[in-house]
Amino acid sequence: MEVPGPLRAASGGAARVSVPAKTLRGVLEELERRYPALHRSICDETGKVRPHVNLFVNQQHMRDREGLDTALGPGDVVIILPAVSGG
């Protein structure tokens, strides 16, 4: 999983973390155990992905695949992309 700069403090400074899981949902469950602060940055208290956070699997948005049930295989890359806004 690729972790963007603004969220790296929540992953112990790591730009990439290896998370063994068979689905995107499994990745988030493992993140909750290993990196709870990173999980809270991605998901709300109900476990849903926050509206301003986009998750991609191999450069394809999860909503264009199977959502959190998107299957993952060896070598797949999950990218976290939080929305940026300003005024």
Where are these regions (language model features)?
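Ubiquitin-like/PB1-type beta-grasp interaction modules and other compact soluble beta-rich domains
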Residues: 1-86
